[in-house]
């Protein structure tokens, strides 16, 4: 599972950087389709791509299986909305993950990319942030971590959702057969 995530993350970053080098700031082509980013509300020098699918929705027959490749699509998708957080128990009001109205779904394997709005042919540092939460809570959306401040300083920042609790970490021989 980690290897597939790593391959997709590297692919997204490489495409983002290559598109920035050629001045195409608002659209990124991936193996699954083309996404159109938007300007960060925190800093107009940053372009944000939210809700980029890195795997097929892990529902139905895919629920207890390793991630499958993202489902290809035609046209251009607006990458301007935070995806749902992966399914998790409701947290107490004291939890950092309880802020706001957290939408939860099993269809949650998405990532977000924050990058400088001005193109650069230089190699850029990349930071991939996986939220905490003890493998039971959290999400990669900007409610918890917004990569705009690092992106405006020249880094490419990627945040990601991953399956939580039993949906992501349940181990049983019947599930692998």
Model feature map: region roles:
Residues 8-19:
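Bacterial N-terminal signal peptides
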């Amino acid at each position: 599972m980690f290897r597939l995530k790593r391959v997709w993350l590297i692919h997204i970053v490489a495409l983002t950087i290559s598109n920035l080098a050629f001045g195409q700031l608002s659209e990124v082509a991936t193996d699954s389709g083309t996404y159109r980013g938007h300007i960060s509300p925190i800093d107009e020098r940053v372009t944000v791509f939210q809700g980029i699918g890195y795997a097929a929705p892990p529902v139905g027959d895919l629920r207890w299986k390793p991630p499958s490749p993202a489902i290809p699509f035609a046209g251009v998708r607006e990458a301007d909305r935070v995806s749902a957080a992966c399914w998790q128990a409701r947290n107490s009001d004291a939890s950092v993950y309880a802020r706001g109205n957290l939408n939860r779904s099993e269809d949650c394997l998405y990532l977000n990319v924050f990058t400088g709005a001005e193109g650069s042919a230089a190699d850029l540092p990349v930071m991939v942030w996986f939220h905490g939460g003890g493998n039971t809570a959290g999400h990669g959306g900007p409610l918890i971590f917004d990569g705009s401040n690092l992106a405006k300083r020249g880094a490419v920042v990627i945040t990601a959702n991953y399956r939580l609790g039993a949906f992501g970490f349940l181990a049983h021989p019947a599930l692998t057969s």
